[in-house]
């Protein structure tokens, strides 16, 4: 007779063998399967897991081809000659290259107008961190020329769900000779053990977490160990329309923090995104 764990493992394995879901982080698929297990009979469970994954991770599933992404990045790198002159010239080359790479993903594309001052403004409030954790990083590891220029020369760890994207980022960072302290890996902030760093980045992630599990964004902020965290929200739609997102997200986030041990140190608005710099009381 199959146990509950047997059913969960079986459904998780079936979902992960599907081409559409095969590059998704396995603990994420198992977590979703476990959450839905008591709600649906075994014969319906696999269908509901797929449905939930599509709802929660539609931006990743089917939207990322790691090999294609890697080729696009390689093309960008080879189109702009690598300078062999002074360090300042190389830094400007890295910034030009990385901005083009950051344009390849919707979330970082919207942020390219802000990178020149984003980390400097954050570090003015938090101090220069010795370590950064970037949860749900997407292509944000390629902002390294901007946070290193702002003084962050320690360890940066970025993680995201899609294996193909992470492998493409790893390979491309090596091609660019990025600092050794920059590490990317496959991971899920809701599935993995809590971590520790000076600065936790949750760019456009808080709302996505809450959509998966109620109040999980706040739960992560309370469980992780950090000196400061930066949580961002979009203030306009992808098409640039103002539909009240800034007010709605601000009210929601401020209300979430009521009664917690967290406080907002500063709110920044850069481009179509707002950033809340948070610390513990």
Swiss-Prot record:
EC id: 2.1.1.179
Coiled coil: none
Biological-process GO terms, alphabetical: response to antibiotic
Catalysed reaction, written as an equation: guanosine(1405) in 16S rRNA + S-adenosyl-L-methionine = N(7)-methylguanosine(1405) in 16S rRNA + S-adenosyl-L-homocysteine
Alphabetical list of Pfam families matching this protein: FmrO
Alphabetical keyword list: Antibiotic resistance, Methyltransferase, Plasmid, rRNA processing, S-adenosyl-L-methionine, Transferase
Entry GO MF terms: rRNA methyltransferase activity
The family this protein is said to belong to: Belongs to the methyltransferase superfamily. Aminoglycoside resistance family.
Protein name: 16S rRNA (guanine(1405)-N(7))-methyltransferase
Species name: Proteus mirabilis
Source species taxonomy: Bacteria, Pseudomonadati, Pseudomonadota, Gammaproteobacteria, Enterobacterales
